[in-house]
A protein has these predicted regions:
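Domain-level signature for soluble enzymes in the chorismate/prephenate branch of the shikimate pathway
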Residues: 1-280
Length: 280
């Protein structure tokens, strides 16, 4: 993704998000990194030419998918995925220095869900205030809008907050996967360890339509790694599927399976072929 020439990256901000931490794994010091308030704004920065790439979260090992990211890729103005990065996520409980009474705690809904046990044990009567990101909650805390926040230790450091307790998540080993999106056109060359993503639209009145899709992948021995249904937003009961498979669109099995799917599906939106991040 990054080259010797400086690239412009949009990401889910503000400063101190897990997305920013993930971005640091794939960028150079010379790259321009601009935070945006939400996933849509970050992706729109690429669509509008304000950025070359956008890094946004797509799924978490505990809470599952980030619906907004899936919907933007499937039914928003076209973008393709050129890479992915994963990041272990740990949460800290933070306050402004000297705080004693905690009644309002800010965080992202996914973070709240991953810290339910801690909140129930330590602050069962506190109001949980949702924010677009954990770092946005930390920023609000620094401005006096909250009594506490659940965010990353990096956010606490950036906003000069006191970490009351670290590593408060209910599940150790939680990981978030992020995707790097760009305008359609360029596709990374095959590496032998690739992932291909697509949005598949089917005729809901056709019995066995989803089974037919799965049979096509089985026919060409293509392994599915992810499948998620999402509403199309047109009518109640109308859904499309986001599908990830192992392999590159230039690999013969993937190429043939996608070509055959185009014959039996209402529509397919190619979302990219890109290197998988292989974790030890």
């Amino acid at each position: 993704m990054s080259t010797a020439q400086s690239q412009r990256f949009a990401y889910l901000g503000p400063v101190g998000t897990f997305t920013e931490a993930a971005l640091k794994k794939i960028t150079c010091d010379s790259d321009i990194k601009t935070p945006y308030a939400n996933v849509t704004a970050a992706l729109d920065a690429v669509r509008d030419g304000e950025a070359d790439f956008a890094l946004v979260p797509i799924e978490n090992s505990v809470e599952g998918v980030v619906a907004r990211t899936l919907d933007e890729l499937a039914i928003g103005d076209p973008l393709t995925i050129s890479g992915e990065v994963t990041l272990p996520v740990t949460f800290a409980f933070m306050v402004k220095r000297g705080t004693q009474n905690v009644q309002r705690i800010g965080t992202h809904p996914h973070a709240e869900s991953q810290c339910r046990d801690y909140i129930a044990q330590k602050y069962p009567h506190a109001e949980i205030v949702p924010y677009p990101s954990t770092a946005a909650a930390a920023e609000a805390l620094s401005k006096g809008d909250l009594d506490a926040a659940i965010a990353s230790s990096a956010a606490a450091e950036h906003y000069d907050l006191e970490i009351r307790e670290a590593d408060i998540g209910d599940n150790s080993g939680a990981v978030t996967r992020f995707i790097c999106a760009q305008k359609p056109g360029w596709i990374p060359e095959p590496t032998g360890h690739d992932r291909t993503s697509m949005a598949v639209f089917i005729d809901i009145d056709h019995a066995g339509a989803l089974l037919e899709i799965l049979q096509v992948f089985a026919k060409y021995d293509v392994n599915l790694t992810f499948i998620q249904s999402r509403p199309t937003g047109r009518e109640l009961g109308h859904y499309h599927f986001i599908i990830d498979v192992e392999g590159h669109i230039k690999d013969t099995p993937v190429e043939k399976s996608v070509a055959e799917l185009r014959e039996i599906c209402d529509d397919i939106r190619f979302l990219g072929s890109y290197p998988r991040e292989v974790r030890a």
